[in-house]
């Protein structure tokens, strides 16, 4: 049997861990190094990194919209800045670089969730254009989806998993 004190300790420790990342990624004057390695001045929002989106888009990011909604526009504006710098929304952004390690582009459902929850502080049209361009790109089998409406297993590894992520 678990005591209330132990249960609370476990809960609040887990909640604390949920908020360790994403991390702020700018200097005290708000300058930051972009994905393209250029240094950018104050963008008008707090720039974030460590978007481990495949791990966080299902639960952590929806949680942020509920309990830390003031951070969400900065997350999304950071993702949109990454899009402007690398030509695609982030996959697994880590301290100024995208690792491209995961299948799918999970920043899309994160942004869509914020739009559906009517969150303010970012440009919906800009977000839509970034999502559309990213999902219409040739990233990891997406060109097959637009041409064939599926990803052939003999042409692309992890075709079923990618198909599920892109659905």
Show which residues each predicted segment covers.
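Acidic/polar, glycine-enriched structural segments that form the non-catalytic walls/loops
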Residues: 1-47, 81, 88-91, 120-125, ...
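Hydrophobic alpha-helical bundle architecture
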Residues: 2, 46, 63-67, 95-97
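Alpha-helical support elements that line or immediately flank enzyme active sites
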Residues: 13-27, 49-72, 112-118
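Flexible glycine/proline-enriched surface loops and loop-helix/loop-strand junctions
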Residues: 43-45, 56, 60, 108, ...
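A short, ordered amphipathic alpha-helix with a cationic face
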Residues: 47-51, 98-101
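Active-site cavity-forming subdomains of large catalytic enzyme subunits
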Residues: 71, 78, 82-167
């Amino acid at each position: 049997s678990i005591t209330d004190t132990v249960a609370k300790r476990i809960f609040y420790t887990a909640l604390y861990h949920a908020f360790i990342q994403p991390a702020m990624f700018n200097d005290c004057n708000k300058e930051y190094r972009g994905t393209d390695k250029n240094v950018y001045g104050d963008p008008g929002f707090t720039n974030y990194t460590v978007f481990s989106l495949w791990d966080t888009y299902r639960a952590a990011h929806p949680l942020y919209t509920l309990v830390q909604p003031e951070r969400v526009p900065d997350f999304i504006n950071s993702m949109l800045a990454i899009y402007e710098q690398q030509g695609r929304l982030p996959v697994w952004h880590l301290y100024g670089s995208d690792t491209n390690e995961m299948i799918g582009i999970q920043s899309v459902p994160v942004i869509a969730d914020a739009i559906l929850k009517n969150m303010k502080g970012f440009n919906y049209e800009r977000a839509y254009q970034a999502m559309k361009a990213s999902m219409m790109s040739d990233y990891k089998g997406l060109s097959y989806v637009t041409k064939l409406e599926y990803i052939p297993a003999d042409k692309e590894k992890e075709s079923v998993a990618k198909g599920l992520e892109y659905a």
